[in-house]
Design a protein with these regions (language model features):
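Iron-associated oxidoreductase/ferritin-like identity signal
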Residues: 1-58
Length: 58
């Protein structure tokens, strides 16, 4: 189950990065910053899940 959640986080990060690039191309600075904040949050979630999975498997 955690593996699926981790994959979902990684997919979200990829999508947000794409959206941030689109916002940048449209000079939507505020939107880009908001999306970058989401990327930070999702990255933290993914890293936490990776740690949990690593600790659980050892």
């Amino acid at each position: 189950m955690l593996e699926l959640a981790l994959e979902a986080e990684r997919n979200a990060i990829r999508r947000y990065k794409r959206r941030a690039a689109q916002a940048d191309a449209l000079d939507e600075v505020a939107l880009k910053v908001q999306i970058e904040d989401l990327i930070v949050d999702e990255t933290r979630h993914a890293e936490e899940m990776e740690r949990i999975l690593t600790d659980w498997k050892t």
